[in-house]
Design a protein with these regions (language model features):
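PLD/PLD-like phosphodiesterase catalytic module centered on the HKD motif
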Residues: 1-186
Length: 186
């Protein structure tokens, strides 16, 4: 059953990423600009991260989501392993460890094998946010989304901000979070 869901998910994700990437193909992400999106539910939050990574490797990435699919976690870990992202702090909703056991195990194992990678935390979280930076490019961004890091059939919205202020605002807030379980610091 997991394989069937994965194939279906990959199709929807490929379709959504193609549309999003085509819309942003010739758009250089510029400091001080907010990019607003609305979709018919075939885009997940990781699709927006791909837009950013097509232009910049990241020294740091903050991910806040209620839930994350195994496919998205695997993709993010692949970006870490290839050096596209050098540090990742992940913050999940309190339902995640018990309702997404396979995915939670995968994430815990990643941080156990890579303690230098960053932090993972679980708390009463429903915020869907990416924030990060590349110091050498002087690039700072945040992305506020209605969608989680898994595709769903709903209308969703996102705002990608290229601006240091909101990025630092989110990093400062999430750095102060106390985790319910498995708080791993790098």
């Amino acid at each position: 059953m997991c394989t069937e869901l994965s194939k279906r998910y990959e199709y929807r994700r490929a379709f959504s990423e193609v549309r999003l990437l085509e819309a942003m193909r010739y758009v250089r992400l510029e400091d001080g600009v907010n990019y607003n999106f609305i979709t018919a539910g075939d885009v997940d939050s990781t699709s927006y991260l791909k837009v950013v990574l097509n232009q910049h490797d990241l020294d740091y990435l903050l991910i806040s989501t209620w839930v994350m699919s195994a496919e998205d976690a695997f993709q993010i870990f692949e970006w870490y392993n290839t050096g596209c992202i050098r540090k990742i702090d992940m913050y999940f909703g309190d339902i995640y460890p018990n309702q997404y056991k396979m995915e939670w195990k995968m994430i815990r194992e990643f941080y156990e094998q890579h303690p230098e990678a960053g932090r993972v935390a679980v708390f009463s979280n429903h915020a869907k946010i990416f924030a990060g930076y590349c110091e050498v490019d002087s690039f700072w961004f945040s992305c506020q989304l209605s969608c989680n890091a898994n595709t769903n059939p709903r209308t969703e919205q996102a705002c990608l901000q290229v601006n240091r202020g909101p990025c630092e605002f989110y990093i400062e807030y999430f750095d102060g979070i106390n985790s319910f379980k498995f708080d791993r610091y790098g």
